Amino acid sequence: MSLPHSLFLVIFGASGDLTRRKLMPALIKIHNGKRFPEHFAIIGCARTAYTDETYRAYLKEELIKSGSLTKEEMETLDDFLSTVHYQSMDPADETTYSLLNDRLKELSPQYENNGNYLFYLATPPLLYELIPKYLHDAGLLKKPGLKRIIVEKPFGYDLASAQKLNKIYAAYFKEEDIYRIDHFLGKETVQNIMVTRFGSTIYEPIWNRNYIDHVEITAVENMGIGTRGGYYDGAGALRDMVQNHLMQLLAITAMEPPAKFDKNGFRNEVIKVYQSLRPLTDEYIRDNVVRGQYIAGDDRIGYREEKNVHPDSRTDTYVAMCLYVDNWRWQGVPFYIRTGKQMPTKVTEIVIHFKPAPMQMFQMKEGLYKGEELIIRIQPDEGILQRIAMKEPGAGFYMGTMEMDFSYDQHDQETGDAYVRLLEDSLAGDPTLFTRSDAVDESWTYFDKILDYWKKHPETPLYGYPAGTWGPKEADVLINRSHAEWTNPCKNLTHSNLYSKL
């Protein structure tokens, strides 16, 4: 994969929150690293009536106000903004696409562009099925030149809507030119899971059912839904986090080593994990899925008191479940996954619980030794921590645990921004870390069964949990069946079992 000589990045939703907070800060880092194509321009599109100059002024003010720019980025900000242009149009109005077409033709001689366009949909999901058709009908997908498109989650609301979107995009773009973005895969610590697994002679031989007792995957937030009530009340935690982010983390944890790490090798192994998930029956869902909704607690309002939320809403803000990957490597190993809003802290991590030695020759002073743990912290305080058995100092042979950890922060190593990596890959035409259409179908096929079950059985419990706590106690009962407990971490990786940030 290599950068084209010239490229236009066309951002729909250019005046929105995602563009301001994520895309532009990432793009200025790529600019400063001199990793843009030789001739490159950004064209922002939205309904707001900006000109090139007023849009640049708006971005400059917002970027400076955010306080996220480094000294170098402040010094090069004007140079970066000189590559930014703006076209006022309504992405929902087909008649305005001719304005965009004319503008791109106008800019093409200046940037030696022969029709190389990368479209980024930073828009509400309801526009996802409209924009490809409008681009096509306006002549913006004609040859010559490469045509790629980046789509944010959610890609579909259920299996039927996801399949409809896949069909629409396949009508106008090649699969290799469709970039369904999941920013979790752009995180350095997520990519490092594969290196830890397949590049380490310590972990690779024991990463299987013979040595691993169970796996936890947690992705929780300490905030409510904010201003997203209108969207979230129609989505819920299962759609918003489990079907995409948690499934990606599960796949990377459980996948087989690809024969070749490229766009097909990696994504083929992801699909195999999805296809190996134990089928969901009504009885299985009833016994292995817990859903919850936060209620008022610790000076925090309940979900039903949030703006734009129905007062009798049954939307899930918490989901915990037990899954099994029924293949040779993982048969019988439970994977416990959970996500939730209004938790005590914001954290995403994977905990691998290894089996204890077959004979307990040494005892602990208190309790039973349950085995060693490997904690892979995705965010915040990114790093890896290994808890291993050690002798307690002093007389006798009592067992204790010792922690060995690596933290990116402590070693002054930047983990990088997920959007930087994913934007760079899309500029270079590398879709490896983006979701393929068959993975979307497989994931929705699996989780549609849970959504259908909840719809058919409205009496399914929706457990309340006070905001600021770790979720409903029924989730504890779920994991206790394996004689295990949830790891409730704090924002710091080291000694995370000792305290939580409330």
Model regions: which residues?
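Secretory/organelle targeting and membrane-embedding segments
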Residues: 1-151, 155-502
